[in-house]
Regions:
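Coiled-coil dimerization/phosphotransfer module
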Residues: 1-145
Length: 145
């Protein structure tokens, strides 16, 4: 199914919670959300890419990892946004190029659009951790004065 997302300004937390609630209905895994990001600090472009990247990583954990627990953590510190999606699933070998499939490339593309860095940590039997880090733009920080 295709998932289209449009966000109104200031609704990041609600959109994220709604999307994860929808996905939780498709799995027995427990999805835990800790969102400390203020919607005010995110523009609509950032919100869409963040929610979609989190969605893709969560779907990967549900479909491929056989995870029982998925943790989503969103935080901002000194102008740096960090989003972590971690699961306790089967994990995979990062050197297995067959696993560099469509979903991973979409997440990399979204990270690039945010001018951020996407790190994936995993090993067979060790679950998976996806970490996106990016710097808030200077223009946005000036608007908050």
């Amino acid at each position: 199914t295709t998932f289209r997302l449009t966000l109104t300004e200031g609704s990041f937390g609600q959109s994220l919670l709604g999307m994860l609630t929808q996905l939780s209905g498709q799995t027995d895994a427990k999805i835990e959300l800790n969102n400390a990001l203020s919607s005010i600090a995110l523009d609509a472009h950032q919100q869409v890419h963040l929610v979609q990247l989190i969605r893709e990583a969560t779907i990967n954990a549900i479909k491929h990892a056989k995870a029982t627990k998925i943790k989503v953590n969103c935080q901002e510190q000194q102008g740096r946004v960090q989003v972590t999606i971690e699961d306790d699933g089967v994990g995979f070998d990062l050197q297995d190029h067959k696993l560099n499939h469509y979903g991973m490339s979409i997440m990399q593309e979204r990270a690039a659009r945010l001018r951020g860095e996407l790190k994936v940590e995993s090993a067979p039997g060790k679950g998976c951790k996806v970490v996106l880090t990016y710097q808030q733009s200077e223009e946005k920080n000036k608007n908050e004065l």
